[in-house]
UniProtKB/Swiss-Prot annotation:
Family: Belongs to the bacterial histone-like protein family.
GO process annotations (BP): DNA recombination; positive regulation of metabolic process; regulation of DNA-templated transcription; regulation of translation
Organism: Nitrosospira multiformis (strain ATCC 25196 / NCIMB 11849 / C 71)
Functional description taken from the UniProt entry: This protein is one of the two subunits of integration host factor, a specific DNA-binding protein that functions in genetic recombination as well as in transcriptional and translational control.
Residue segments, region Disordered: 49-70
Protein name according to UniProt: Integration host factor subunit alpha
Amino acid sequence: MTLTKAELADLLFEKVGFNKREAKDMVESFYEEVRIALQNGDGVKLSGFGNFQLRDKPQRPGRNPKTGEEIPITARRVVTFHASQKLKAMVEKNQHGKDNA
């Protein structure tokens, strides 16, 4: 199962007590602030969850798989996510719990 933005808003509605509009706006605002920070070149640290960081990848040679022709892959900036140790431990603990069930 994948948790969507709409489902996240529904959870805020159910668990926190926001009305549906407030919950949707809260989720949208959170994502927008993360996007803005990354667009401005800043990393985003969510304590106990993980870090979103930007990484510059240099230009490198590539190859067209159909023709074998060498083509340059342009330099680009990518977003990476590194889970915190706390999140990793919780996921691992949950996985072990499922294995034993």
